[in-house]
Amino acid sequence: MFAVHLMAFYFSKLKEDQIKKVDRFLYHMRLSDDTLLDIMRRFRAEMEKGLAKDTNPTAAVKMLPTFVRAIPDGSENGEFLSLDLGGSKFRVLKVQVAEEGKRHVQMESQFYPTPNEIIRGNGTELFEYVADCLADFMKTKDLKHKKLPLGLTFSFPCRQTKLEEGVLLSWTKKFKARGVQDTDVVSRLTKAMRRHKDMDVDILALVNDTVGTMMTCAYDDPYCEVGVIIGTGTNACYMEDMSNIDLVEGDEGRMCINTEWGAFGDDGALEDIRTEFDRELDLGSLNPGKQLFEKMISGLYLGELVRLILLKMAKAGLLFGGEKSSALHTKGKIETRHVAAMEKYKEGLANTREILVDLGLEPSEADCIAVQHVCTIVSFRSANLCAAALAAILTRLRENKKVERLRTTVGMDGTLYKIHPQYPKRLHKVVRKLVPSCDVRFLLSESGSTKGAAMVTAVASRVQAQRKQIDRVLALFQLTREQLVDVQAKMRAELEYGLKKKSHGLATVRMLPTYVCGLPDGTEKGKFLALDLGGTNFRVLLVKIRSGRRSVRMYNKIFAIPLEIMQGTGEELFDHIVQCIADFLDYMGLKGASLPLGFTFSFPCRQMSIDKGTLIGWTKGFKATDCEGEDVVDMLREAIKRRNEFDLDIVAVVNDTVGTMMTCGYEDPNCEIGLIAGTGSNMCYMEDMRNIEMVEGGEGKMCINTEWGGFGDNGCIDDIWTRYDTEVDEGSLNPGKQRYEKMTSGMYLGEIVRQILIDLTKQGLLFRGQISERLRTRGIFETKFLSQIESDRLALLQVRRILQQLGLDSTCEDSIVVKEVCGAVSRRAAQLCGAGLAAIVEKRREDQGLEHLRITVGVDGTLYKLHPHFSRILQETVKELAPRCDVTFMLSEDGSGKGAALITAVAKRLQQAQKEN
């Protein structure tokens, strides 16, 4: 028993001594946690350098865009071919991707050798050889009669400008075929395939083996957004935000970046951790000074590193009693498979002895222990370096997503990772230590990167088909110049129709006289009350105007109008308004005051004078009973009487559009048009009295409230009316009415978007084909969400957050489509508004007999003010359709309430002038 203990002690002491000896000798190969964190930081900096346009040309880590923009979503199906060229043999596959939802893949494959004379010979011969092998495979599998898409896995650094193209930057590993560098490998292979007249194959995608690995794993796990290969060579790819990729135009969505991390350190960034053995290995390689990171990591080099170390130790008398065999002097005699065998847990020492004996050496027990530890240090350093670079990628992903914890999957492949008994465990452990804020799953790519190339091709086919479907829907909202000119002409005709006495009663564009006959001239003065009713909020204002200084001071208070009041009785609505006025007067210390009042009433009214307005019909969600056909000024007066607390002199009832024009007209006498683009949509303008047949008198001008929201109610714009507009119209409070407003105003745009999203989801193009309860809910898409989603400053991640707030769980690709839909709907709205406005400015130019008209438009409304693109598109449309009109757009900063007070002040001024005359 004692002897056994003695032997165990002796062996353990021997092992300890040998390990210490090797540790001392290879001190520089052992990397501390601090060193790994430093390498991680350096790699982050190299990634940034590679992504930036200015620094990419000199970057060692090239960060190549792959033009792979989406990962599989499970809806892919069909038959695809795949080629994998990049190692000691290449593979051809036929991949059958199952019908939707089943995520099942069937594969048939065949390996072909890549002889040295082919991979180091002439480039044309290489591609002809590959094409011959593909033809052989198709003949064997009876595929010659089929037209099939093909994905090419090409495991060498390529610069791509599209998915189906790749210019070889440099050969790596053992490949050295002449005349291929700086040429498009897809074109070269396509040309070689043309020699086979009976083969009909389209190369749809060129991918790196790393990208193929990521796509293979992503088919099984949608969280997979990183691919890593640790085999003959080493590389990594990951999904980067487009907004960070300077080399590719556009900032929507994500794209897979092939890091080509094997070249990390080629610019000297890793000199402090490279050892004499790394330098010696590099000098003896096919590409000295290149792929320095790869030479410290990959399977092509680990065995050689071990050989160089053993040779040096033997020369120093630290191994084999100082004896060296000719095999130990021979390059390539120790391979990575030997390193893996020597590190096996139980039989490792026995394997070590056997391998060393095969090398012509006579190892002692101590030698075997030492050699095994050399292998451990070399392979552990490899895993550590890989872990540091991968941790940098994971940190970048987490920061891109702006999350505290990242959940992600890394697709893994490569012979070193697969065959080495300790490698995966070591890599995983170090990664988790370096990035504790990331929950990482490592998924082995069972089918290799070739299946991934087929998956990229399948995704490309799916995306192509889906893109066509989405484009068909969006095309309905893309108006041509001819269509806009047609809308302009029809609006012009409807304006004329509404002005004529004979046709006025039947006109859909009402062209209502407002009896506002003058603009402010700067002499107005006094205190005025103004009411502003037109949306879910109601404002009461006290406006103080000072003569001669164009100075206005305003005090206002906003009151809510509950839905039950909006849709209750007329008496309840006006009693609520008077209650709000009483509260305001009390608040301002004006209880019992008698002041002139202007009433901004943003609904279509027929007026017989400036202080009389008969409601034609409610819009914007109001439905109060017993109001339509009644004079709203009388209804307000009666409500004031019922309260019997104060008396007000109601001087003017005006539309919000007129109020907007007057507010801007106070600042700019050239302002003769008012436009509201908000909850509703409307326009007013100063018309020559001679053209207004419903009002007597031919001198001067009068403001006409067009009520253009009703344009199209007679079917004149049915050619641009879509099925989605019909859905929105039928679900509205006033079906068949206000059709132009329903295509252009903030109240309806979000609802049009929702209808499109439902349709696209039904077609399986969005939200994984699942229509959530939230998406079925009318009104969830408020215009403010459209404005936020379309903001240029908003990254897709924030768009996804907005959609999540709306209860819609979207992918990155979904977010892009939602943004496109919002853009198409709001663009059409702005263009239609622009076409309508162009009709009015052209009419004013022609009426005045001018070659060129200069005019100002006063504008208000949340859509115009808050939407990031609406105002620009509207202005561009007006410029294009009315080139002889110089139109200035002036934002009404104080809303239509100030305008009502100004109209009241102007009316008072004109009344006073009449009295004096």
UniProtKB/Swiss-Prot annotation:
The positions annotated for binding ATP 2 are 532-537, 679, 746-747, 783-787, 862-866
Q: Does the keyword Disulfide bond belong to this entry?
A: no
Record-listed E.C. numbers: 2.7.1.1
**Location of region: Hexokinase large subdomain 1:** 208-447
What is the uppermost EC class here? transferase
Residues annotated for ATP 1 binding in this entry: R30, D84, L85, G86, G87, S88, K89, K425, R426
Chain residue ranges for the region called Hexokinase small subdomain 2: 521-654
Which parts of this chain are annotated as the region Mitochondrial-binding peptide (MBP)?
A: 1-20
Per UniProt, D-glucose 6-phosphate 1 binds at D84, L85, G86, G87, S88, K89, F90, R91, D209, T232, D413, G414, T415, S449
**MF annotations from Gene Ontology:** ATP binding; D-glucose binding; fructokinase activity; glucokinase activity
Locate the region Hexokinase large subdomain 2. Answer: 655-894
Q: How does it sit in the membrane?
A: Peripheral membrane protein
Look up the record and name the pathway of this protein.
Answer: Carbohydrate metabolism; hexose metabolism; Carbohydrate degradation; glycolysis; D-glyceraldehyde 3-phosphate and glycerone phosphate from D-glucose: step 1/4
Q: What keywords are assigned to this protein? A: ATP-binding, Cytoplasm, Glycolysis, Kinase, Membrane, Mitochondrion, Nucleotide-binding, Repeat, Retinitis pigmentosa, Transferase
Query: Which catalysed reactions does the entry list for this protein?
Result: a D-hexose + ATP = a D-hexose 6-phosphate + ADP + H(+); D-glucose + ATP = D-glucose 6-phosphate + ADP + H(+)
Q: Does the keyword Transmembrane helix apply?
A: no
Hexokinase domain boundaries:
16-458, 464-905
Organism's domain of life? Eukaryota
Q: Which residues bind D-glucose 2?
A: S602, F603, T619, K620, N655, D656, S681, N682, E707, E741
Q: Which residues bind D-glucose 6-phosphate 2?
A: D532, L533, G534, G535, T536, D656, T679, D860, G861, T862, S896
List locations, semicolon-separated.
Cytoplasm; Mitochondrion membrane; Photoreceptor inner segment
UniProt record similarity statement? Belongs to the hexokinase family.
Q: What does this protein do?
A: Catalyzes the phosphorylation of hexose to hexose 6-phosphate, although at very low level compared to other hexokinases. Has low glucose phosphorylating activity compared to other hexokinases. Involved in glucose homeostasis and hepatic lipid accumulation. Required to maintain whole-body glucose homeostasis during pregnancy; however additional evidences are required to confirm this role.
What is the disease in the record? Retinitis pigmentosa 92: A form of retinitis pigmentosa, a retinal dystrophy belonging to the group of pigmentary retinopathies. Retinitis pigmentosa is characterized by retinal pigment deposits visible on fundus examination and primary loss of rod photoreceptor cells followed by secondary loss of cone photoreceptors. Patients typically have night vision blindness and loss of midperipheral visual field. RP92 is an autosomal recessive, mild form with onset of night blindness and vision loss in the third to sixth decades of life.
Question: What protein does this entry describe?
Answer: Hexokinase HKDC1
Tell me what gene encodes this.
HKDC1
